[in-house]
């Protein structure tokens, strides 16, 4: 086991604070409408230019082990805030730096760090409650666009395209961000349910131009096993043929003579059918088949529930207004499912999201909700160069997370104003303990730091602006983008309450742990001797 370097007291705390400051100073320059870029060197390809706090934080590793521990703890603040709210990482970092800097003064002066932390926690709890009270719902498309614009560093185009996407697919819909092919941002919307399985044979194509199989007013047969014997299918096919309507078959697989017969019937025009594989695998496949059944008003034919394919009737089949099947995707538009049943299914999946432990499971469940409740929108980010594309994509993703957070918990005045106004909740907060009261004072001062940094990045004088904002009331604040004072919400400078709340909670949590640290242990790097020179090769014998 390698030897350890153990350090105590003020000396080690100072090193930790140095690490915090190095990371926070790199991140804080990106805050606000006039925040600057950070350029990050990459081992492969061109440099990465970003204004995203968490991206900058993730790149920082320091040589000194103790400084690096401080930096990594603040990195955790940014990452956690990003995981919960998807934005606000720079605000969280600035708050953490401020709480640590203020708190260390009190610790050095001999106050009890544990009581300071308790005071900080009580102050944060009061602020969070106040933020919830002052938050207003974010319902209109205009407000959603404003939140998106602010998060994307005042890029109004980004805000507008996100608002349009949310309008098209609903607030629960899936919105993804991809690289575009042109210079402009584009929005593609897939209405209805889409899953990533295409036709099993190109002979099913009936629209040669689009290379898709389009079915109008079709029946939908859902089966959870393989179909290889055409005899099992014949009774259903005959009933569908009598009804003179097309049929989509979704099964684990369709192969052999069953597939061949369907193709021949299709080519001859006897019966318009298309076969596709069921989406997903294992239990997820069963769940998705059930989703499709509820969406189309059909039943999954499964031997597990005593249903067999040869006894299936038209009542067991789902129906839809139109279904389009491409090489890799199938889209069901306007299923005939019962709205109440669809809502109940969505509520059931939401319940599963609450209890899911892995991010992957949550993401897949969220996709299922979106496919049932709304649709899928794809924002294609356009840019002139690859470097610009990456930077723009970062901002669009941030803005998307921010708008989702705004819809969830409402919005508050942006530009650091909400935190200043929430301080009213601390005026009458007395803990009955001098050291805990000092913890409350630490938070009182720290909540000014985001506004101070926004003003500093815009080239203003932070103290002057903070005093002027404190003289006002309600949503009165400073718009660093235009240099004006006024009602922040009317000027469209909004922050999601969830982002502000998460930033404050995570910053205080990690900063509190730092203040109560009195010993740090790091490995002493071993000085490995250099590799010895390789011996020379022996001389070759004389050649004949």
UniProtKB/Swiss-Prot annotation:
- Cite a single GO MF annotation: ATP binding
Show the HAMAP family listed in the entry: CH60
- Subcellular location(s) of the protein: Cytoplasm
Catalytic class of the enzyme? isomerase
Q: Which GO terms describe its cellular component?
A: cytoplasm
Subunit details: Forms a cylinder of 14 subunits composed of two heptameric rings stacked back-to-back. Interacts with the co-chaperonin GroES.
Kindly provide the name given to this protein in its UniProt entry. Chaperonin GroEL
Q: Please state which protein family the record places this protein in.
A: Belongs to the chaperonin (HSP60) family.
Give the reaction(s) catalysed. Answer: ATP + H2O + a folded polypeptide = ADP + phosphate + an unfolded polypeptide
Q: Which UniProt keywords apply?
A: ATP-binding, Chaperone, Cytoplasm, Isomerase, Nucleotide-binding
* Species: Neisseria meningitidis serogroup C / serotype 2a (strain ATCC 700532 / DSM 15464 / FAM18)
Q: Which GO terms describe its biological process?
A: protein refolding
The family database entries (NCBIfam families) matched by this protein are listed as: GroEL, PRK00013.1, PRK12849.1, PRK12850.1, PRK12851.1
Q: Under which EC number(s) is this enzyme classified?
A: 5.6.1.7
Function according to Swiss-Prot or TrEMBL: Together with its co-chaperonin GroES, plays an essential role in assisting protein folding. The GroEL-GroES system forms a nano-cage that allows encapsulation of the non-native substrate proteins and provides a physical environment optimized to promote and accelerate protein folding.
Show the PROSITE patterns listed in the entry: CHAPERONINS_CPN60
- This chain is encoded by the gene named groEL
Give the binding site residues for ATP.
30-33, 51, 87-91, 415, 495
